[in-house]
Amino acid sequence: MSDQASDPYMYDDDSSSITPEDCWTVISSFFQEKGLVSQQLDSFDEFIESTIQELVWEDSRLILDQPAQHTSEEDHENRRYEITFGKIYISKPTQTEGDGTTHPMFPQEARLRNLTYSSPLYVDMTKRVLKSDDNAGNEHELEWIEEEIKDEEPSTKVYLGKVPIMLRSKFCMLRDLGEHEFYELKECPYDMGGYFVINGSEKVLIAQERSAANIVQVFKKAAPSPISHVAEIRSALERGSRLISSMQIKLYGREEKSTSNRTIKATLPYIKEDIPIVIVFRALGIVPDGDILEHICYDANDWQMLEMLKPCVEEGFVIQEREVALDFIGRRGALGIKREKRIQYAKDILQKELLPNITQDEGFETRKAFFLGYMVNRLLLCALERKEPDDRDHFGKKRLDLAGPLLASLFRILFKKLTKDIYNYMQRCVENDKVFNLTLAVKSQTITDGLRYSLATGNWGEQKKAMSSRAGVSQVLNRYTYSSTLSHLRRTNTPIGRDGKIAKPRQLHNTHWGLVCPAETPEGQACGLVKNLSLMSCISVGTPSEPILYFLEEWGMEPLEDYVPSNSPDSTRVFVNGVWVGTHREPAHLVDTMRSLRRRGDISPEVSIIRDIREKEFKIFTDAGRVYRPLFIVDDDPESETKGELKLQKEHIHKLLNAEYSEEYATNEFGEEEGPYGWSSLVNDGVVEYVDAEEEETIMIAMTPEDLEASKSSLTATQQKSLQLEEQELDPAKRIKPTNSSTTSTFTHCEIHPSMILGVAASIIPFPDHNQSPRNTYQSAMGKQAMGVFLTNYSVRMDTMANILYYPQKPLATTRAMEHLKFRELPAGQNAIVAIACYSGYNQEDSMIMNQSSIDRGLFRSLFFRTYMDLEKRQGMKALETFEKPSRSDTLRLKHGTYEKLDDDGLIAPGIRVSGEDIIIGKTTPIPPDTEELGQRTQYHTKRDASTPLRSTESGIVDQVLLTTNGDGAKFVKVRMRTTKVPQIGDKFASRHGQKGTVGVTYRHEDMPFTSQGIVPDLIINPHAIPSRMTVAHLIECLLSKVSSLSGLEGDASPFTDVTAEAVSKLLREHGYQSRGFEVMYHGHTGKKLMAQVFFGPTYYQRLRHMVDDKIHARARGPVQVLTRQPVEGRSRDGGLRFGEMERDCMIAHGAAGFLKERLMEASDAFRVHVCGVCGLMSVIANLKKNQFECRSCKNKTNIYQIHIPYAAKLLFQELMAMNISPRLYTERSGVSVRT
């Protein structure tokens, strides 16, 4: 750094303060290192690298005891068979072909051949046989001696199954490849990974939101319930089984009714009744009343709380020994067993099931008692109204389960199943005295198929229990536009019933700030339940808590067992992951130490450290699934000379910038080089810090570095006021800066940039801070339907459907966040010249007029690809179906379309023009000789047609044909068809502000209005679209785009910057235009000046995927349903248009009976029935050729009537008959009087 001249980024020395530009440099370094899907990749890597191994070791020993058989003299030994699981091995993804060869697999091949991108998993298994002598007698434990096994190898590597691999994770083939290698592998360098390829389709795991385990929460209960307050905790072990045992402590009696009998009871797992709290304490070995009270109430002078505890102590007065208390609990758990057993049962429950997160070992009763007391204390504080009840929707008390935990829970179930199978095999072998083969014992299909099934269907759980499992966890990755893909990978889901109209969980909560996007959520039933992560938020993968406990013990934490509340009334309680581990007398010092350890990197940066001064609590969380985000640290050390400034200095910015150009390396404390200076170097230098929602509430955050400067510079309040007045006179539209009174200048952190609170879809909106909030939400949904280039390798991909815009442009008004969303490289829209005017009236109600000449020149044209797929089904080695060109002579049931375009191999050649219902893949199935094919079959027909026709509503050109084999070695074909879609009347377009509209009419160039310079707009939208929607940003975008097209620079439309409409107007004026963007226009037909000036300029428009050609539908006659003989439903099946209940009601109200009859019967399912005039049933046998009619049961051949009723009515009558109800139809002429 000494050689300043060579440094390309040297600033003036006086500008030592951090500018917004510097903040963007830091943000750049964040995205360079992390990317946008790091939360998916990190979580999956954690699963592969450590979780699988832990799950395998969780129940790593299978033990089978075989008692002595005593069949012969020698055979008096007990045998014990033992199988142990050891290390696991996983490699890069491979594919085993049908002929048994194995080769490495790349994602593109998996996509094209419909394979699963997965890696084989192996595990070391060891078997031992131990024996013991039976003659030793049964007084003491049997001694197990290793039985000598001749040359048995110590451990065998056994194949467990295949695990799907997430793309771009550490085990993926594409990790850390260069640009050129991507090209050779036909992968797009912009593809960010984070998804799986299962059977050729790309699947994302959506993050699932849940409440955090191991935290105590107190809630109020509503009036009718006898319980007024309840404290609950859902316990889960930190590592290993997700078995959650929950426990509640309930405060009975409502304060209105009575004050005397407000008892407190606990709900214990596996115990049917609620147990009075005092009895639980006594069962835990805390017997005297005084000790119990001391565990609950930490202040002996707090008479209110002691008064609340009086009824509880009285209730438990009858039981005064530990044994009796245990027996009391045991009686209510296990029925009909002896007293000793009951006591042991109660002991086991208290040890293993009560608060298992503290420990499941014995001898920790005091810890559990203190924690129980803490829960009761929290409950009473809430009941005494000294503390608010907890907020269920607080985001800090939520966790997101990503790929790692989700796959872990699945793998655990499957692995348990596998070990059970191994155990059963072992038992069978021992019983039948067979040789035990490890490789045969393991059913590798269990894990392979189980994982694949869940990822393919989204039903998370076992296949057999598909009903109980969660649905929609895994979804097909949305590949419409690049931003829709990104957004899908950062989506979170809250599994609450969608139908319940509960508002609370759906609302935006204060704690969501910076962690989830405030704008991007769907409309309708999932609103607020499906969220998207903000740009810089990450999710913790979880770190072990042991090192932290070790640190705490080093730094003077007193263990909980030694805690005596009366001796140290002011000490602070220390919690780690919700477990109370001890107390500390100097919390401030401890917190500072822990923070500095975290900033130095001795503790993982994702650990959150929370000190609640008021409640005298110090909480540390290290668990997985916490959402956190980075912030700049403000130096608040009173001794430091940079007090009140950012820890981030100019030198850090220089290092970051230089790392891009020179080989500037970060050095760690040992002076070793660690690669270029980047984001992680900033974290290690203690300049930025990760903060989660819970910790965020204990710190003070400045919005921008400027605010920090303002609070630091000690202007008096009056000086600030006068400064503000001056500013206000300059520009009324300027942002109002918060005035910092000198009391609140205790900032500890600073936002990196406020625009980072937005998610992927909302970051594309220019000036979102100038729009009404729902408009941003609408655009966030619509931006995902815009056409663009979804990936650069679209020409080699065979997606089911793909839309590519001919000529996508980057927007003239950009946001800084777009650089990191690759929106410049892969845009989704075009800059259209837009006039906001009424012209001819064809742009009313959100329609717009489009310039036909622009369309002819290629404006908003797009390509559409659709892929058809088929394969030859096989049974074992013989093929059931064959690709061929079916011939009329020997094939049954040929389709309507033409078979002429097929080649002899049954496939169509690329470049051929096809239209609706043409056959593009010819395929036949052999007919077994003995089947009767509904009377159509003759002896010539040996095959049935199974061809694939083109969709009836589409036409185009065959683009690409891929013939290959799938994983089972069956022949397999994909045919891609392409069409050009030209904008026409009825197609849907939208600007980036939720201003959507359809094309109302297209005028040629000469019919459009023009400006004095002869510029003609591409679009004319209606001015009525603006005022009620308040999308001011739409107008500012137009102004800014106009300026940037004149100046040749990109306009910066990022949110929360100092750009004002006034500033943009000034620039526009300097370029010689009217400052507010109005222009004089001339009528296209007459050439006269228009009466009003027209707001005119370029605006970025998106072509959306709803096109009129894909929706147009009409039908006269066509296919009908088999059962009701009414027209089928849906455009794809050429269905009818439903005349529904509401339409029927309108016709009844209108009184148009003839029309009603025609719609509901004649045009639908009219049917002729013959009815017997005697019995009124449809039992007539009619011979229409001979004109003979007869009702056999009535012996009636003359009194018969022909009526017309809807077929559905006939069906109803027959169904009633089947239920033993006889509907009799009498006509006017049958003369039967129906009594009224």
Swiss-Prot record:
Annotated consequence of substituting E727K = In strain: MmRL 1636
Reactions the enzyme catalyzes: RNA(n) + a ribonucleoside 5'-triphosphate = RNA(n+1) + diphosphate
| Record annotation: effect of changing A519V | In strain: MmRL 1759
State the protein's purpose.
DNA-dependent RNA polymerase catalyzes the transcription of DNA into RNA using the four ribonucleoside triphosphates as substrates. Second largest component of RNA polymerase II which synthesizes mRNA precursors and many functional non-coding RNAs. Proposed to contribute to the polymerase catalytic activity and forms the polymerase active center together with the largest subunit. Pol II is the central component of the basal RNA polymerase II transcription machinery. It is composed of mobile elements that move relative to each other.
Organism encoding this protein = Meyerozyma guilliermondii (strain ATCC 6260 / CBS 566 / DSM 6381 / JCM 1539 / NBRC 10279 / NRRL Y-324) (Yeast)
Give the record's keywords alphabetically. Answer: DNA-directed RNA polymerase, Magnesium, Metal-binding, Nucleotidyltransferase, Nucleus, Transcription, Transferase, Zinc, Zinc-finger
Cite the binding residues for Mg(2+). Answer: D846
Its EC number(s): 2.7.7.6
Record-annotated residues binding Zn(2+)?
C1172, C1175, C1191, C1194
Regarding protein family, the annotation reads: Belongs to the RNA polymerase beta chain family.
Covalent S-S links between cysteines: none
What is the name of this protein? DNA-directed RNA polymerase II subunit RPB2
**CDD domains found in the cross-reference section:** RNA_pol_B_RPB2
Other comments on record: The binding of ribonucleoside triphosphate to the RNA polymerase II transcribing complex probably involves a two-step mechanism. The initial binding seems to occur at the entry (E) site and involves a magnesium ion coordinated by three conserved aspartate residues of the two largest RNA Pol II subunits.
Compartments in which it is found: Nucleus
Result of mutating D401A?
In strain: MmRL 1635
For molecular function, the Gene Ontology terms on record are:
DNA binding; DNA-directed RNA polymerase activity; ribonucleoside binding; zinc ion binding
Entry keyword Flavoprotein: no
Coarse class of the protein's main subcellular location? nucleus
Q: Which GO terms describe its cellular component?
A: DNA-directed RNA polymerase complex; mitochondrion; nucleus
- Provide one Gene Ontology biological process annotation: DNA-templated transcription
Q: Where are the zinc fingers (C4-type)?
A: 1172-1194
Q: Fetch the Pfam families from UniProt.
A: RNA_pol_Rpb2_1 (PF04563), RNA_pol_Rpb2_2 (PF04561), RNA_pol_Rpb2_3 (PF04565), RNA_pol_Rpb2_4 (PF04566), RNA_pol_Rpb2_5 (PF04567), RNA_pol_Rpb2_6 (PF00562), RNA_pol_Rpb2_7 (PF04560)
Describe the effect of S722T: In strain: MmRL 1635 and MmRL 1759
